[in-house]
Amino acid sequence: LGLYPGEFERVPFEDDYFVDVERLKTFVKSCDVIVHLAAVNRHTDAHVLYETNMRLVKQLIEAMEATNSCPYVLFSSSIQEERDNEYGRSKSDGRKLLEEWAVCNGASFTGMVVPNVFGPFGKPNYNSFIATFGYKLTHGDSPTVLQDNEVNLIYVGSLCRHICDKIREMGSRTAPSLVERDDVACDFEMKVSEVLGLFENFKKLYFEQGIIPPLNNIHEMNLFNTFRSYIDMESYFPVKLVQHTDVRGSFVETVKIGVGGQVSFSTTAPGVTRGNHYHTRKMERFVVIKGKARIQLRKVGTDEVLDYYLNGEEPAYVDMPVWYTHNISNIGDEILYAQFWINEWYDPTDSDT
């Protein structure tokens, strides 16, 4: 939603609204649409998990009824509704409670039954086996496959687009209120062992050698961007490049790629900064060829800034993760020469910038 500030106005929400009834009431009164994603995914006590998830739904309903508010509610349930566990039951029962509220109050409701979600920054050992694989492989551990099932997977970006489209559809709807179960389609299916095999290849080529691996489709690209998100940015970058030097000068290999894209270079005057944008899908590499540079990265939604100092006398690169604002500044006294590789040709109509 934050990518479309001219279309959607986000109403701030904090977790502690669930322990402050008045603030929760104020929140629901301010909303035309509420997307309810809050839930406990795992807990050592299954009863606590179920009761917590149900309590969150009931508190939302109570706040809406107390304020006579009838926003369009989208609820994130799970394909685990069909499984015999407390998490699945909590999602199914929560969805049905919200359906009943919508019918009784003439409100619109979409109960999304969502496949297994993955994407950058998921919590290892909690959100997804993909998060666990990515974290372990980039932190010196070796994951194992416990159950090699075929898994329905959806990238978090696809789910967000689906939610945005649902809100748009409701905004243009002229018919009476709608109450629906929405079985969200997966992006693709893959065995757990196949995901692990891909990630092990990402580790071997990219994490250990700096080679951009072959990515055969958008799903593998999304998996690669997810893998990259678990790298410890502060300790991993910048990566020094090998210089081959003789009487003729120096030769440096800056990027080895298994995919296409676009290579460019820039000159930057002393004291000038380029960039200050982020990408949601693109991969990008900055290489300092000559001069002194500072590259800065900041994860969207946080205040921590990572500073990397590079010098053309020791050529090195920094790769830009998705959802990190980045820039490059000339901190020297001479012209800065930098090379950029990005995995897509620039398209001004879809710049992802």
Regions found by a protein language model. Name each.
Residues 7, 99-122, 135, 141-152, ...:
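Conserved beta-loop-beta element that borders a ligand/cofactor-binding pocket
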Residues 16-67, 80-84:
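NAD(P)H-binding glycine-rich loop region in Rossmannoid oxidoreductase-like domains
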Residues 55-105, 109-112:
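Conserved Rossmann-fold NAD(P)-dependent oxidoreductase catalytic core, especially the SDR/UDP-sugar
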Residues 158-243:
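Mid/C-terminal beta-alpha module of Rossmann-like enzyme folds, strongest
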